[in-house]
């Protein structure tokens, strides 16, 4: 019985590399542990209120009368490899203030393949309540996962309209860093299967999203960038050239390093503009994304 197993409210760190969000409702999350397969229920402050099976946690969520948001446009923020929801700083809060039901999700990015992570997003969307439309804001590998998600025949798309996609610092052409390091066992150990899938040959095989998408690259706006080992302008990890993808509705370069560009205060307005209109607007644009 869930009520017997339920502990007193227990603070957690929210889960990054060992927990996967499987159900979200108004900031509450049911998460699955990547190794044990058991579930837990966290509130919007990452306090655990129940654990056990998925039905156990859903029962407790319903018992607490946590209502689905009245905003029917969900925006999922999907972080990159080795990172977590904090990647986006206060961007989710800013999007909620602007009227979107924005949620930065957790997934075990170094424990599984890109296909595994896309399947997690698919389950999450299949369970989404009161949602008519979903858009995505991604960082780094998060964009590759969403491309994989959108390239499949997903059941959720029969009732939820895919909206727009903003990819921040995505390795859309694969990553020369990943290709160089992929044979080394320390890289394989740290970044797992997904890290080995970020090579140009594997990433470029993914279909181009069939929804409006925009790309925000990090860089210096010059020919050298931050990292002398990455050709051309770059954010220290991904080159501007690697972020590009034919068919982009808009493209911009934002000064910043790879790990920090998604939390830059300067990114809020372009993201909001694109979610609303499909253009970054009033920012320095580069054609032919």
Where are these regions (language model features)?
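Short aromatic-enriched loop/helix-cap "lid" or pocket-rim segments at secondary-structure transitions
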Residues: 89, 116, 175-181, 224-229, ...
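C-terminal catalytic-base region of ester-bond hydrolases, centering on the histidine
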Residues: 209-289
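Short, contiguous clusters of charged residues that form electrostatic/catalytic patches at enzyme active sites
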Residues: 86, 116-119, 123, 266-269, ...
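Generic hydrophobic alpha-helical membrane-span motif
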Residues: 85, 146-148, 175, 241, ...
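Short, solvent-exposed loop/turn segments at secondary-structure junctions
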Residues: 82-83, 110, 172-173, 219-223, ...
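Flexible, membrane-associating and regulatory peripheral segments of lipid-active enzymes
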Residues: 1-75, 84-89, 93-103, 119, ...
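Serine-dependent carboxylesterase/thioesterase catalytic core
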Residues: 76-81, 96, 101-211, 235
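Residues that form or flank phosphate/diphosphate-binding pockets in enzymes
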Residues: 86, 112, 262
């Amino acid at each position: 019985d869930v009520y017997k197993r339920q502990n007193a409210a227990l603070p957690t760190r929210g889960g990054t590399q060992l927990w996967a969000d499987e159900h979200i409702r108004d900031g509450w999350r049911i998460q699955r542990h990547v190794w044990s397969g058991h579930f837990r229920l966290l509130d919007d402050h990452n306090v655990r209120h129940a654990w056990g099976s998925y039905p156990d946690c859903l029962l407790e969520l319903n018992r607490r009368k946590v209502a689905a948001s009245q905003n029917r446009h969900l925006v999922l923020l999907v972080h990159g490899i080795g990172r977590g929801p904090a990647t986006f700083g206060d961007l989710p809060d800013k999007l909620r203030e602007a009227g979107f039901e924005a949620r930065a999700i957790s997934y075990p990015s170094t424990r599984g393949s890109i296909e595994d992570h896309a399947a997690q997003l698919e389950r999450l969307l299949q369970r989404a309540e009161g949602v008519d439309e979903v858009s995505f804001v991604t960082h780094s590998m998060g964009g590759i996962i969403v491309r994989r998600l959108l390239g499949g025949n997903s059941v959720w798309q029969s009732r939820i309209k895919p909206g727009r996609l903003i990819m921040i610092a995505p390795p859309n052409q694969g990553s020369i860093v990943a290709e160089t390091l992929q044979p080394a066992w320390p890289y394989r150990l740290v970044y797992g299967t997904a890290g080995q899938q970020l090579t140009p040959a594997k990433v470029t095989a993914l279909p181009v999203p069939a929804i409006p998408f925009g790309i925000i690259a990090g860089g210096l706006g010059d020919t050298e960038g931050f990292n002398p080992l990455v050709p051309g302008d770059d954010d220290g990890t991904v080159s501007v050239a690697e972020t590009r993808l034919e068919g982009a509705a808009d493209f911009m370069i934002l000064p910043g390093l790879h790990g920090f560009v998604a939390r830059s205060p300067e990114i809020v307005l372009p993201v909001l503009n694109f979610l609303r209109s499909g253009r970054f607007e009033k920012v320095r644009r580069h054609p032919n994304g």
